[in-house]
């Protein structure tokens, strides 16, 4: 038999081993049932790890999370929305609007160079030699879409003003083509320029003698492309035809006390 001192040391060593085992078990329970040896988890795949997490070696995983703006970044969302809206408006303004109601206006186009008005004749000729109030100078302007794009036709002949591939102004009975669509551009001098929608950079223009000029030789700053909208002689809009109605109310006077206001009868 050993000495009592050796037996006591063996007992203490046995108690220490039991305490260590209890600590290991409690740690394993806290990690959960799927947690095992840390050395075993290093060899497992990365499918259970969250996106964007880095490994111990410092390398990214195969499928990182996309870089979406945070929910709280209001400035980023506000900067993206106007760009999307502008792109949508620009794309839709280039397409004929088949759903909205057409806005039809009637007026004359006064040429800055010739000093007269644009007219569409029955022989399909177009010039700027009409006087004010001429029936062939009365034009009907139809909206094509919301991007200031219009179709212009003569009210007397029903022919549309179009432009061919050579830049020459021609008259057509069917104005559904893009060559019969013009974009209204309001200039700084308050004149209006009409740019063809099919041939960008080509404008409706007339010389001093009222003859049409080729669109390929026109620029926006030239006087030949400047027009002014004028109502036909004797033509009034709905707003101008309306008259104000004045109602005769009795005059406003004070009573004798001065604290209350009364209506005095109107003198006859």
UniProtKB/Swiss-Prot annotation:
GO CC terms, sorted: external side of plasma membrane; extracellular region
Organism from which the protein derives: Mus musculus
Induction: By androgens.
UniProt keywords, alphabetically: Developmental protein, Differentiation, Glycoprotein, Growth factor, Mitogen, Pyrrolidone carboxylic acid, Secreted, Signal
GO biological process: aorta morphogenesis; apoptotic process; blood vessel remodeling; bone development; branching involved in blood vessel morphogenesis; branching involved in salivary gland morphogenesis; branching involved in ureteric bud morphogenesis; cell fate commitment
Gene3D superfamilies: 2.80.10.50
Annotated signal sequence range: 1-22
Top-rank taxon, per record: Eukaryota
Record carries keyword Transmembrane helix: no
Record PTM: The N-terminus is blocked.
Expression sites by tissue: Absent in normal mammary glands and detected only in adult testis and ovary and in midgestational embryos.
Protein name, entry field: Fibroblast growth factor 8
Self-association and partners: Monomer. Homodimer. Interacts with FGFR1, FGFR2, FGFR3 and FGFR4. Affinity between fibroblast growth factors (FGFs) and their receptors is increased by heparan sulfate glycosaminoglycans that function as coreceptors.
UniProt GO MF annotations: chemoattractant activity; growth factor activity
Encoding gene per record: Fgf8
């Amino acid at each position: 038999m050993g000495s009592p001192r050796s037996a006591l040391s063996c007992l203490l060593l046995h108690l220490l081993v039991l305490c260590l085992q209890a600590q290991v078990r409690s740690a394993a329970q806290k990690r959960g049932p799927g947690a095992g040896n840390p050395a075993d988890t290093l060899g497992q795949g990365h499918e259970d790890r969250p996106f964007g997490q880095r490994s111990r070696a410092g390398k990214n995983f195969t499928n990182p999370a996309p870089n979406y703006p945070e929910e709280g970044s209001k400035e980023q969302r506000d900067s993206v929305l106007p760009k999307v809206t502008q792109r949508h408006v620009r794309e839709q303004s280039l397409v004929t609007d088949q759903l909205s109601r057409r806005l039809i206006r009637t007026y004359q186009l006064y040429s800055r160079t010739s000093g007269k008005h644009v007219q569409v004749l029955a022989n399909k000729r177009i010039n700027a030699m009409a006087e004010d109030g001429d029936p062939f100078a009365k034009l009907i302007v139809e909206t094509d879409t919301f991007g200031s794009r219009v179709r212009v036709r003569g009210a007397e002949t029903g022919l549309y003003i179009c432009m061919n591939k050579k830049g020459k102004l021609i008259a057509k009975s069917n104005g559904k083509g893009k060559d019969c669509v013009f974009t209204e551009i309001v200039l700084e001098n308050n004149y209006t320029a009409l740019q063809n929608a099919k041939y960008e950079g080509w404008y409706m223009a007339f010389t001093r003698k009222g003859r049409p000029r080729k669109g390929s030789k026109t620029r926006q700053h030239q006087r030949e492309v400047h027009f002014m909208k004028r109502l036909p002689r004797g033509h009034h809009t709905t707003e101008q035809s309306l008259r104000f109605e004045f109602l005769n109310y009795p005059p406003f006077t004070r009573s004798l006390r001065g604290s209350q206001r009364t209506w005095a009868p109107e003198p006859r």
